[in-house]
Amino acid sequence: MTVEDFEELAAGAPEHVSLEFLFGQVGAKVMPDGDHSEMIKWLQRQCMQHRPDLWLYPEAGLVVEAYRKGRARPDGVLAPDGAFAGQGEWAEAAGVLMTVEVTSFDADTDGRDRREKPRAYAEAGIPVYLLIDRSTAEAVIHSEPVKGEYSVELRLPLGKVVTLPEPVGFDLETGALLSLIR
């Protein structure tokens, strides 16, 4: 399938279906549960407090992977306010400082959130990828993309202070997320 074919398919998908195209494969994102939504809301608030010059855009469509062949809808995209003005459904990743994913409880989570997305985001040159892994109750911080891979991966249990590296550059007190792990 070509990127153009995928974009046509995604444009015709029902409103409640969110499709992604990573490494030549079409995938459907699971609709978030309440705890997932609360985690994203909490993270939006943290980003606003620490970096009011930035905004955590939920579910923004991004052009990812090497050669701009992939399309992803991260749970959150941290970028300067107004970064996506004038862009279409699938925006260029230039200017994006961080992508965020919160794991879902589906069969695709391991391959998608833990393997494919770090590679796709690193290939796009996104400086930081934050994975809130509900299965392991960890925050996984990927940073310093080099040749399509993140050269640094740090795993911290939720409840600890998580330092997001530059260019994001602030600490997250993740204790509040523990009540959303079930």
Feature names for model-found ranges:
Residues 1-182:
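Gly/Pro/Ser/Thr-rich low-complexity, intrinsically disordered segments predominantly at protein N-termini
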